[in-house]
């Protein structure tokens, strides 16, 4: 009758519900060996289950809001590029930067800052 049916990818479910965050060094957007290993496990799961991903880049509180927005985006883009190299389609991976706006730890310590220098996969 002229209607359209648009199929949407199902969100990742099952064991992929807990995708791993990856962490970065200070002022870095380069993936560490640990980050690459975590992303390889995540990519395998997503390939098996299907679905779309959103990569959220985050930073610690140091630096300007503008600088950290750009750094968070570089982190998200680095993750997307690596996942693409593992066979995930770029069209199925969205990226966003939250800069320093979504800390998971708020203490002014190196240990806390390290927890905030991350990319979360959703």
Outline where the language-model segments fall.
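Periplasmic OmpA-like peptidoglycan-binding domain that tethers envelope proteins to the cell wall
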Residues: 58-122
């Amino acid at each position: 009758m002229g209607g359209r049916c648009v199929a949407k990818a199902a969100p990742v479910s099952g064991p992929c519900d807990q995708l791993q965050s990856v962490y970065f060094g200070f002022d870095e957007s380069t993936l560490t060996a640990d980050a690459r290993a975590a992303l390889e496990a995540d990519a395998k799961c997503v390939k098996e289950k299907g679905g779309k991903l959103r990569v959220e880049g985050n930073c610690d509180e140091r630096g300007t809001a503008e600088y950290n927005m750009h750094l968070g985006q570089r982190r998200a883009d680095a993750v997307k590029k690596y996942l693409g190299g593992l066979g995930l389609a770029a069209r199925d991976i969205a990226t966003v930067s939250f800069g320093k706006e979504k800390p998971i730890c708020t203490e002014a310590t190196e240990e806390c800052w390290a927890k905030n220098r991350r990319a979360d996969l959703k």
